[in-house]
């Protein structure tokens, strides 16, 4: 593996992004060997990562939104190599990047390639991996059903608008949650199982989550009496509902839902009646800003 070889896996819709082109050119002018591959359809990111690992690339850059980031991160982790991950946030929500303190400007984001990569955890559920968060309940449906055109025009506010227009469909989910020293059963409106802190366009469901603590943060919003009003508050930023959440920090979590539970894994839908969530400590090395809020400690000196 050549430690200087970097490959940017770029979402196809960003191929004409002039800021990205300028940032890539600046990195090359500074002496970095930076190649670019563009995705076109589902599965491309995984295939490109596999080919890059076989070709000896030392670092992969995920250029896109949270979905692209999840695909690249999962493929890297399954490759079980030494390659690291950098993040070029180009989506609508960019939830993981925002929580981690990664700049949204392409040049500043690519400058993090100079930061030492830190080992971070990945979440897993029923054989699938996720970098940021698994969400369930009404919130996962909002995220999954928010159109790409609406997100392009309104940005993160698109999630709020979609939620508001779907109030007539609101109904609570029912589940039983089991983990070491944690048991909860009942109806809930929203669920977050976080490696990261926020999802769905800026909704901070797991405010204390860290990506290097070997644990998952669980946040359950039990069904309140004023369900529609509470949902509006949650989608509008969450102020005023913090005290309603049931929270835990666990190495694994089992969820049983007799009627099935819709879960969103960083943009990928999953449904099941029995789900087991776990964490893979230090599964991936990622270039994060010094002092990132998602890290527990500064890097060790070699």
Swiss-Prot record:
Main localization category: cytoplasm
Keywords: ATP-binding, Cytoplasm, Kinase, Lipid biosynthesis, Lipid metabolism, Magnesium, Metal-binding, Nucleotide-binding, Phospholipid biosynthesis, Phospholipid metabolism, Transferase
Enzyme active site: 268 (proton acceptor)
Binding residues annotated for Mg(2+), in chain numbering: 210, 213, 215
Ranges in a coiled coil: none
Record keyword Lipid biosynthesis present: yes
GO cellular component, one term: plasma membrane
Designated name of the protein: Probable lipid kinase YegS-like
Species: Pseudomonas aeruginosa (strain UCBPP-PA14)
Lineage of producing organism: Bacteria, Pseudomonadati, Pseudomonadota, Gammaproteobacteria, Pseudomonadales
């Amino acid at each position: 593996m050549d430690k200087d070889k970097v490959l940017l896996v770029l979402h196809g819709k960003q191929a004409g992004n002039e800021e990205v082109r300028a940032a890539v050119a600046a990195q090359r002018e500074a002496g970095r060997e930076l190649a670019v591959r563009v995705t076109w359809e589902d599965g491309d990111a995984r295939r490109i990562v596999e080919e890059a690992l076989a070709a000896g690339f030392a670092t992969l850059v995920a250029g896109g939104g949270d979905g692209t980031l999840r695909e690249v991160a999962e493929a890297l982790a399954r490759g079980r190599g030494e390659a690291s991950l950098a993040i070029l946030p180009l989506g609508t929500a960019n939830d993981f990047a925002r929580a981690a303190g990664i700049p949204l400007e392409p040049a500043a984001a690519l400058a993090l390639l100079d930061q030492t990569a830190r080992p971070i955890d990945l979440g897993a559920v029923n054989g699938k991996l996720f970098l940021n968060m698994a969400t369930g309940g009404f919130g996962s449906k909002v995220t999954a059903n928010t159109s790409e055109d609406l997100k392009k025009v309104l940005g993160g506010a698109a999630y709020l608008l979609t939620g508001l227009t779907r109030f007539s469909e609101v109904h609570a989910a029912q589940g039983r949650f089991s983990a070491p020293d944690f048991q909860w059963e009942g109806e809930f409106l929203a669920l977050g199982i976080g490696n990261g802190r926020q999802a769905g366009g800026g909704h901070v469901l797991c405010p204390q989550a860290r990506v290097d603590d070997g644990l998952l943060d669980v946040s359950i919003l039990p069904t309140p009496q004023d369900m529609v009003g509470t949902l509006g508050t949650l989608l509008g930023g969450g102020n005023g509902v913090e005290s309603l959440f049931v929270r835990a920090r666990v190495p694994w979590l089992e969820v049983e839902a007799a009627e099935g539970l819709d879960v969103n894994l960083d943009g990928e839908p999953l449904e099941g009646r029995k789900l087991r969530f776990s964490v893979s400590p230090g599964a991936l090395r990622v270039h994060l800003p010094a002092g990132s809020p998602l890290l527990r400690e500064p890097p060790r000196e070699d």
